[in-house]
Design a protein with these regions (language model features):
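Active-site anion-handling motifs in enzyme catalytic cores
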Residues: 1-161
Length: 161
């Protein structure tokens, strides 16, 4: 089923803008966060930046992102996250980043849900912007929790060795 995904960039994002997905009032009342960091930033400053980002994610009402490194912490913190799938151009460059991850996220898209389900070969957690109650965003799927528990156990066992 993943061989069809190289076409998703044109299917999901046919020259769209953020305003196509998110109401203007939500954008105006939001904080935009960039993750670009100077390559010369020292370790202590990086740790401080990471802590500040995690605090922002934890206290957010909703996070809308196209970045996995933002979405995954939001899932673990219980912060509602809507993942905008973009940048997927071909199997070799991008699919390895998405395999097994998108099953556990809510995807914000303009695409018809059934078409996306067909492209992915399974039911995905997809939302059209018109379906979202922006004051009460959808809760994250809980399917990732069983994997989180397995990882916690493995990490604890490793640390205790």
């Amino acid at each position: 089923p993943f061989k069809k995904l190289f076409k998703l960039m044109d299917v999901i994002f046919p020259k769209s803008k953020i305003e196509d997905f998110i109401p203007k009032d939500v954008i105006l009342n939001s904080e935009k966060i960039e993750h670009y960091i100077n390559g010369e930033t020292d370790h202590n400053a990086l740790m401080s930046l990471a802590k500040n980002l995690l605090n922002k994610y934890a206290s957010a009402k909703l996070v809308i992102t196209s970045r996995i490194h933002c979405a995954i912490p939001c899932l673990s913190l219980g912060t509602p996250v809507l993942f905008i799938l973009k940048g997927l151009r071909d199997e070799n460059q991008h699919m390895s980043r998405f395999r097994g991850i998108l099953d556990h996220m809510n995807i914000l898209t303009l695409q018809n849900k059934q078409e996306l389900n067909t492209l992915f070969g399974k039911k995905m957690n997809c939302y059209h912007p018109d379906e979202i109650d922006w004051e009460n965003p959808p809760k994250n799927p809980s399917t990732f929790k069983k994997y989180a528990e397995i990882l916690k156990k493995k990490c604890t066992m490793y640390i205790n060795q």
